[in-house]
């Protein structure tokens, strides 16, 4: 097997279930998938699941680690269900583009952007 393509996934933590499915589908295609950490529901104990980094005082560290994942990737795939792209995800897109990484989107959000390439699975 030749070197597998490395894909970094970006998207809101509100899409955690869909992100996990997308990771699995891309892995089945033989890709190495880098993404953010998905935590089990029991971890949160009443905390807001979408902003856990802020609550634990580690948002800056987690954001920097994700940028290093983008550095390691061959391409970036954005899970933008319903066209949603939050502030952190937009920052990751901007970073990837500034560093010459191809950026693809699961759903078209702008006619000037590339939509997910045909080799990647549909996610609903």
Predicted features, each with a name:
Residues 1-124:
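Conserved catalytic or regulatory cores that recognize and/or transform ribose-phosphate-containing ligands
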